[in-house]
Amino acid sequence: MLLIPAIDLKDGQCVRLKQGDMDQATIFSEDPAAMARKWVDLGARRLHLVDLNGAFAGKPKNLEAIEAILEEVGDEIPVQLGGGIRSLETIEKYLDAGLSYVIIGTAAVKNPGFLQDACTAFSGSIIVGLDAKDGKVATDGWSKLTGHEVIDLARKFEDYGVESIVYTDIGRDGMLQGINIDATVKLAQAVGIPVIASGGLSNLTDIENLCEVEEHGVEGVICGRAIYSGDLDFAAAQKRADELNGELDDA
């Protein structure tokens, strides 16, 4: 089970939002690269970056911070990024800069042809981000709820060749209410590609519950507010996940 720390970028700083509201941002660090180093030193095997300004603007807005993070840890672990990715040129620029994966969200839902082109051009590097509330997909920084069923879209995108799916239950994100395990498993069982859970992770119990369903295709979990607020000790949680998955050697 991959525990993936999230570094949400707003105006070059590492912040957390409450339910996607840009006006409800808590600044956790003015040095995102130092934050990235901290999580890697604590045992992170992948990082999840979000360009919040980019998500709302529809184009990259935190390039300097992203490049600083990649310079700091990009040679050590894979780094994925979402937010504002609306063109093949942007994807190419990010992958050339050292990102391992880019996450396409709103653009995938609104313009499936773009996602298809991206999967063809950058095979193995495209993750799709599906944000849903009550099984229905939301777009545009969660401001618009669509009529699309999340499972239908996930299956379609799997056919296009996406690497994996980051699934966010937007009713719970940033609220520390616990991961929506049932909805995550339901999605993972419906597709043959890995699903990464997101939204609402609150404590070690969530991690233990996710490890129990890993066999259904739940590959990892995005760790957001809980590891910043202290509700979850990241290093201890990754260690516990490894124990549960029998990945610890007898050493």
Swiss-Prot record:
One Pfam family of this chain: His_biosynth
Localization: Cytoplasm
Keyword annotations from UniProtKB, A to Z: Amino-acid biosynthesis, Cytoplasm, Histidine biosynthesis, Isomerase
Gene3D superfamilies linked: Aldolase class I (3.20.20.70)
Swiss-Prot/TrEMBL catalytic activity: 1-(5-phospho-beta-D-ribosyl)-5-[(5-phospho-beta-D-ribosylamino)methylideneamino]imidazole-4-carboxamide = 5-[(5-phospho-1-deoxy-D-ribulos-1-ylimino)methylamino]-1-(5-phospho-beta-D-ribosyl)imidazole-4-carboxamide
BP terms from Gene Ontology: L-histidine biosynthetic process; L-tryptophan biosynthetic process
Disulfide linkage: none
GO molecular function annotations of the record: 1-(5-phosphoribosyl)-5-[(5-phosphoribosylamino)methylideneamino]imidazole-4-carboxamide isomerase activity
UniProt xrefs under InterPro entries: Aldolase_TIM (IPR013785), His_biosynth (IPR006062), HisA_bact_arch (IPR006063), Isoase_HisA-like (IPR044524), Isoase_HisA-like_bact (IPR023016), RibuloseP-bd_barrel (IPR011060)
Catalytic site positions: 8, 131
E.C. number(s) listed in UniProt: 5.3.1.16
Cellular component, GO, one term: cytoplasm
Main location, first listed in the record: cytoplasm
Domain of life from the UniProt record: Bacteria
Group of enzyme by EC: isomerase
The protein's annotated pathway: Amino-acid biosynthesis; L-histidine biosynthesis; L-histidine from 5-phospho-alpha-D-ribose 1-diphosphate: step 4/9
PANTHER family: 1-(5-PHOSPHORIBOSYL)-5-[(5-PHOSPHORIBOSYLAMINO)METHYLIDENEAMINO] IMIDAZOLE-4-CARBOXAMIDE ISOMERASE
Homology family: Belongs to the HisA/HisF family.
Protein's name according to its UniProt entry: 1-(5-phosphoribosyl)-5-[(5-phosphoribosylamino)methylideneamino] imidazole-4-carboxamide isomerase
Annotated source species: Burkholderia vietnamiensis (strain G4 / LMG 22486) (Burkholderia cepacia (strain R1808))
Gene behind the chain: hisA
